[in-house]
Amino acid sequence: MHWLTAGLMLLVFALAFSIDLAPSRASHLAFLQLHRSVGVTVWVLTMARLVWRSLAEYPNWPSDMPQTMRVAAVASEYALYALLLAQPILGLLQTSARGDHVDLFFIGQLPALIEQNRPLARQLLTAHTAVGFSLLGLIALHVSAALFHHFWRRDDTLTAMLPAAARLRPLSSRAEHPCEADESPSRAEC
């Protein structure tokens, strides 16, 4: 679910930045409705992830990982979940306050959450935008931390996040194979 969320967030941000660049009013509205639909999907997926998270065992930390890094990892995870839940709700509230609606993937309308209120809609758009940029920053921090663990600390943090079929051997174990060590056996033995 991690990578599905990541892919959907990439799509949501691409749509958000494309809406105002749309060549026509029709494509503008189509991008906007798709952005809203994918945002609702992210919210549902995040709720499912939280349920899964509450039932699943927490992943093992690298044994040499300092307590401060563990606290930072948990805090950033909770912050990501909070923003992933808040962002679509703010978007839905803003849409309702504008007097607009969400056509969920063009197959059905979601009900308005609040009555039309244009001044509130502007404030909600500001909040939605601020949370969006906060999410981008937190996602950048998340990716940077994963790369730091993989390339600097050489632990299994990044590989543990990969889908099972795509898992690579961690950097720390790459030289452990006899054929890759400095004193490698003859090619026939490999």
Predicted segment positions?
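Membrane-embedded alpha-helical bundles that constitute the cytochrome b-like, heme-associated redox core
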Residues: M1-C190
